[in-house]
Amino acid sequence: MIITKPKDERILRDAAEISVDILRQLRDVIKEGVTPLELDILAGTLCSKYGVEPAFKSVGGYKYNSCISVNDVAVHGIPKDIPLKKGDLISIDFGIIHKGMFTDHCWTWSVGAPNAKNEKLLLAGKRAVDNAVNKAIVGNKTGDLGYEMESEAKRNGFNVFRMFVGHGIGKSMHQAPEVPAYGSKGSGYLLVDGMVICIECQVVDDSGQVVIDNDGWSARTQSGGDSVMFEYMVIVRDDQPEVLTDTQDWGYVV
């Protein structure tokens, strides 16, 4: 989506604010013993409270309010009724529909203090997406963003999932352009003022090969290595991108 109307921009901002507030409330109840399914049920309750719809239920028969991925599940995790344990990595990918506008964003936390490798993984994943966000300015291309994400992952000894990509967003969940977490500088789609994109990256302690569970959704690392995912909704601007789902100062330990 390219924003051309002030009304659309206002609705999009409101949607992002509500979406972040719901994710914040989910974050605040993550602890040992809580199940991803309980978190997903709470997400649905909060959507009803705010008068919004869970966006992911609009996608291809998906029946949950969120995607919750734990440890080696990198993305699209089905919320399971399995209690979280100390040291687990949990990613909550979440979005809403508010007055016809969609949101989509994600954060990863460690349940309690992470081990040294997972702390490095968390930092690399967050930096990868933060670095890409800084490149979301007019005149750059999607390959500039992808280059930043993959470079940061590999610099730390990790890889990215290439099967799943960021995307445009607005009046539908997935729009052009695709924003891969890999690429070369100066390649891909040109970024223009007012373009709204989701910049996401799954950084994995693995080869980057994907295994899909029998549930048809949960995407795991092939070797069982852990994974993290971070995602922001961003408006492309001339000098400095605007992060709509501004969770950049959040911590990664709960």
Predicted regions and their residues:
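Active-site neighborhoods and metal-handling regions in enzymes and metal-associated proteins
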Residues: 1-254
